[in-house]
Amino acid sequence: TMPAYKDSMLTEARLASASFHKLENDKIEIEFTTKGAQPYTVKIKDYKAYDSTDLYLIKPQASEYGISLFAGENINTKDFVFQVAEHNDSTIIMQLPFAGGGYIQQKFWLESGSYMMQNELSFVNMDGIIPRNVSMLDIDWSVVIPRLEKGYKNEKQYSKLDFYYDGDKKPEEIGRGRDGSERIDT
């Protein structure tokens, strides 16, 4: 059964139908779903997998990205359909509105000639929705990366995820050759 939300706009977003939108540059094509405001597929252009098929870093239904937080009640963004506020070839902005007038915003963009997707998470006018004593949120991203190379053992050993804290010049690394997690307090 679906949980009942105190915020009527969350209930509406939970029941809404998702839509799909693409960002694309000369290097990469990313399809997003509004359900959870997250990447749905990621295709690398000009490269092929070991079996000569298109090279997908993320295939359909192989990724789940959600932000868990307390916003008057416990929520996880993966459960809600966001509204598209802006979309063109290189940028998409999706928002999850709350009845109090605030919203959670996910902005994704691609720059020409780059394989990197940029992401900016914002909490806009959420002062009356997220209590002041809430200083943490959990970002959970689970993704199954398809086999891309013929030598799976070598591929697994050298696969990793890097992320940057705002203002950092050197990336942090999660999980080379294994599952990994990182806790970041806000």
Language-model segments: which ranges?
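Soluble non-transmembrane domains of integral membrane proteins
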Residues: 1-8, 13-186
